[in-house]
Design a protein with these regions (language model features):
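A short, N-terminal amphipathic alpha-helix
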Residues: 29-39, 77
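Generic N-terminal amphipathic, Lys/Arg-enriched alpha-helix
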Residues: 1-21
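Active-site anion-handling motifs in enzyme catalytic cores
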Residues: 25
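Asparagine-centered polar/low-complexity signal
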Residues: 28-29, 135
Length: 139
């Protein structure tokens, strides 16, 4: 019989479903990413669209420069729970959301020239850096 512990044997009363996250595996991967950043001068951001489990943000913060977000709620989560740089990007923003998004962001990346033309003044008024996503084939 194996002496290896199973999840069931170590956490028999945990309600299900639940997420089991191996923080050490995350830290191991982030250590590699941080080393690449240190050697290259690049910055690494956590994309909240793919991983927004704020319960492990404290373990991740030392290795990343901040977050990138594609909605108002993600921008707020990054600013309030992760810290560091907060980048905002979305293919579309509702006009009533744009002021809230910009109030939580350090950088705003516009999806197209028309979005830039309509909302640039909001980012400029806030004094945050801006960017423009360019897709030469379809933009």
């Amino acid at each position: 019989m194996s002496s290896q512990k199973t999840i069931e044997s170590t956490t028999p009363n945990l309600p299900t479903p639940y997420y089991l996250i191996d923080e050490q595996a995350i830290v191991n991967n982030l250590t590699i990413i941080k080393r690449i950043c240190d050697l290259s001068g690049a910055k690494a951001l956590l994309a909240l669209k793919c991983f927004a489990t704020w319960g492990v943000f404290d373990a991740m913060k030392p290795y990343l420069h901040g977050t990138t977000s594609s909605s108002l709620n993600e921008v707020r989560l990054g600013a309030e729970k992760f810290g560091g740089e907060t980048h905002a990007y979305s293919v579309a923003y509702a006009e009533h959301e744009i002021y809230d998004v910009v109030s939580h962001a350090d950088k705003f990346v516009f999806n197209c020239f028309s979005q830039l033309n309509v909302f640039r003044h909001v980012a400029d008024d806030k004094g945050i850096a801006i960017g423009l996503r360019v897709n030469p084939i379809t933009s």
